[in-house]
């Protein structure tokens, strides 16, 4: 394999897949060495001077003319954003050339990325023109058969043929007008490998797999899923429009119910989605959708990449869930795992690795193909059929199930040959662009992001990367990798460190701000205080770190709150709100943490006697009116509604004007709002001066100390805060905290308040400052609008939902009576 070197003066020839000059199944052509032609007109997709050498498709043009690939690019847009990147020009030239060369080959021999990514319509089991056709890539197999319930597991009459690319196929005519392989019947791929042994495997492209739940450790069986038209779920609702800033609710369907059992897709759709919408999230991120034989892996050891996890239902049930989310105005992201695969042999993709060469396997050979910490297999991203498999996998979930995007898991492991194991990243650019960089994987991600944004321009693609790789979240045509967002993974680590190791008085305001704002310019981040990672057994959620065992005895509103409970609820609200407001360009919360779900997540396993007790969500806690969980939930609902109204996450205006270590106060502006956070354990500041940009009158927009949020009601919501000019006009150094205006506020301990500048026209819309008092609710109402119209921050669909309503929107109520 070719490895990157940042010191090379010219880019070497691309690593081509085995028999690269090849057609896809059913496409005529191919059969020789690749011949690269050169023409005179330069490619316009990449800025700067180019030297012609290799050919790529002119994808921006309507015709199929072949034009030149860049060998060297004098200038890329990413250099304007970060001039330090130009030092690694050789790396980017190499990366771009590899990407364009791969696109060229796919265009030439497969008809382009869009056609290439339709692999799921050619591979696996498909019905075409009165016959069932099955294709499988298994170059190491010497003989192959299709077996299943349809032939009593006897493949003697269903032997398969192999082509020169290692693809086995069989065509079985319909019997009496019906498919020879019935819907919902079990199937397997039987083949003999070089050692002479016959083995049975689940088809790699299978769309459904099940196991016998009555038998301990029973292996999975592949199931042919091809329901008749009357049983297929038909989507009824359009995709919601892409929000300016995603507010993501991370969820696991299986553990989403109250009962100690695996919940279903339909139960989640009917019972949990309305809760998510009521809390004013605009996006749902679903974990563990791809089939995984080990439930406790949280879905990250995938065995069957095209199969819906059967524990929670069928593919049609999952479609119902996604469609229901769309009807509520919720976009749906899928947690996709392309960084590795389960080590399982009998029911996983690893079963196709029978000791052959790396170009004949989905995975690298030897140590390079094994992740020693995850005990899993690592893909060979330079392999032609691996690219087809993974790119088609993305398209399958996006086209067939209407997912609106993906969260790519384990991107750090993909970016580097060392996979980030025992590696601390200091920010030195040589850590990102060196021989350790896995260019094969980067090229795959560039192809994937280009494809997804071409198929669905409004797609949202999120990368889980802890390294801080530069330009990971810049467009491919600028020289980036193409993701829309990366997760701000340092933020939860900071909060956990403080809650475990530091007294409140020793919290550093500047350190908190530095952690929240430490992100690359022009590369968007999703901020979160805690995700599923902080909830698993062995760790604790923020609420449980704050209140611990007192959550068992002190959450009743029928008794006075203890100091621990008061502190816990106050800091729970503050930590999540400052993370949202200052930490990124989007926000994420894991299911249940919005109301401070106690304890931890522990999947059923031998060590807990296969118990589901800690693998569920106790919604009754937040639904019980006399328990204090309702306060944290109400604040979560209100801060999401505040962002919906003011769109501060998508604003480029972010100014931190005060980080007072003595007072334990942080003041900053984000968008049109001024935020004041007082982390001091017991000091109230009266007449505390707060800097701001624009003069005028300010009022409370959101107050964590409001009674409706379990606070003490110390901040007046009917008070107008008038600004005073600061310093000399035009002389910023004479301003207060570098702000030209200021106003004074009351700031109680352990509270956070957001202030907005009064606009009388806007006041009419706010109807009396409902958000400020915490009197904001989401209700279903009849509204008239065209399909897809946004009304007062809420989504309106043309179809009626299950409640008989035509749509929904946020309703701001202004009186105490209205909120009862």
Swiss-Prot record:
Pfam families in the cross-refs: Alpha-amylase (PF00128), Alpha-amylase_C (PF02806), CBM_48 (PF02922)
Transmembrane domains' residue ranges: none
UniProt keywords, alphabetically: Amyloplast, Chloroplast, Glycosyltransferase, Plastid, Starch biosynthesis, Transferase, Transit peptide
Signal sequence annotation: none
Keyword Transferase carried by entry: yes
Keyword presence, ATP-binding: no
Annotated positions binding (1,4-alpha-D-glucosyl)n: 153, 188
Entry similarity comment: Belongs to the glycosyl hydrolase 13 family. GlgB subfamily.
Miscellaneous remark of the record: Isoform 2 lacks the putative transit peptide and may be a cytosolic isoform.
Name this protein carries in UniProt: 1,4-alpha-glucan-branching enzyme, chloroplastic/amyloplastic
Organism: Oryza sativa subsp. japonica (Rice)
Upper classification of the organism: Eukaryota, Viridiplantae, Streptophyta, Embryophyta, Tracheophyta
